[in-house]
């Protein structure tokens, strides 16, 4: 598959974390172009403008100035790209917002418009041909599962005649495109490093990853993520003890712990993954929308979180919380320190504008009594499907195909 993504990563992980839309960014597509030459291969909108049709099938725009991860959301009545019924059994209840009573649908009608270029239309048949005989592995937390289910639906809905097979399990769930020999899996590993049971305690081992990584090493395309679970406390905390070296801790600075774990992951990638065969990506932090003060000027609901939000944030500033910024910075620092950096699929900024895209109380995991208390129960972390993760996968598709 070549070395496109690692080279792109060198640019992205070293970029400044831009909070203002107009600030300059090194062009990701310029690097795409230079790499295509090396391998011998031969305008942005503002505001919520209405578009009556999708961009044309291929990449359009100036590759030397295109900024895939900076841009704006534009209304597009040809969206969404699929319905859950197009991929039966794939979208789980926690992401199927329309099934569980979400009364509005405008949040489905937005398309990401990068600066100085258009994203190509997702073509499932083309993706299947490109990835024929390959194994794709998503590894991480439920945001990775969000993206995995989205990618399956994008492919199945645009190439409905292909034979498929799905098995769900813990930690591994797998979807197969039988006619193309493609295996696409999700492996649940919210911290990436191992958690072992020791004398009845869940021990998070910051220096060990082989227990999880044994499931990853044969993949041709690896997409990793971690982030949200490092902030959980109380009953939501994912460990009882943390082991670092020969020492055990009940807790430690969460950013320090995350960095240690990611350096263990990075060392594994550098020493166990054949980068001439396998491409490695890392999904940046998917932001939450639990605090309306982050977007107060454009709040449409007056609620205490994402509940009732029905449209994206407009304007030129990206409302990224300091905590999200710090989590992302840990990832950037670790990737930048790699000899051959994984490519950062940098969805943080564009996702921060989508306060309207979360399940809120319209999730199959939220009970009726919880729905009556949206200020306490709304899910403002995950994303509805169809929805925002479809754009993450359009970006992935663009990088792989173009």
UniProtKB/Swiss-Prot annotation:
Record-annotated membrane-spanning stretches: 7-23
One GO-annotated biological process of the protein: defense response
GO molecular function: O-acetyltransferase activity
Membrane topology reported for the UniProt record: Single-pass type II membrane protein
Any single Pfam family the record assigns to this protein: PC-Esterase
Keyword Manganese: no
Function: Required for nonhost resistance (NHR) during plant-microbe interactions. Plants mutated in PMR5 are resistant to powdery mildew species. May act as a bridging protein that binds pectin and other cell wall polysaccharides. Probably involved in maintaining esterification of pectins. May be involved in the specific O-acetylation of cell wall polymers.
Name of the protein described by the UniProt record: Protein PMR5
The organism of origin for this protein: Arabidopsis thaliana
Gene that encodes the chain: PMR5
